[in-house]
């Protein structure tokens, strides 16, 4: 389930965030993104975390 993020979340996660992930963080390649943000921010299997 994807929802529009708040402004702060937009800066962290990009366009979308995924409910159910720790701290509502994006999921990159099946793992929550804890550093920087997801490149695509949609939980895609080929998504990658970018640097902060």
Curated annotation (Swiss-Prot):
Chief localisation class: secreted
Disulphide bridges: none
Gene Ontology process terms (BP): cell adhesion; regulation of blood coagulation
Recorded superkingdom: Eukaryota
Keyword Secreted (UniProt): yes
Motif (Cell attachment site): 42-44
UniProt keyword annotations, A-Z: Cell adhesion, Secreted
Record's GO cellular component terms: extracellular region
UniProt xrefs under InterPro entries: Ornatin
Record flagged with keyword Secreted: yes
Subcellular location: Secreted
Function, in words: Potent inhibitor of fibrinogen interaction with platelet receptors expressed on glycoprotein IIb-IIIa complex. May prevent blood from clotting during either feeding and/or storage of ingested blood.
Family, per entry: Belongs to the ornatin family.
Protein name: Ornatin-C
């Amino acid at each position: 389930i994807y929802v529009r993020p708040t402004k702060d979340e937009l800066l962290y996660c990009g366009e979308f965030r995924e409910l159910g992930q720790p701290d509502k963080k994006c999921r990159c390649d099946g793992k929550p993104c804890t550093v920087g943000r997801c490149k695509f921010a949609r939980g895609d299997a080929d998504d990658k975390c970018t640097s902060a």
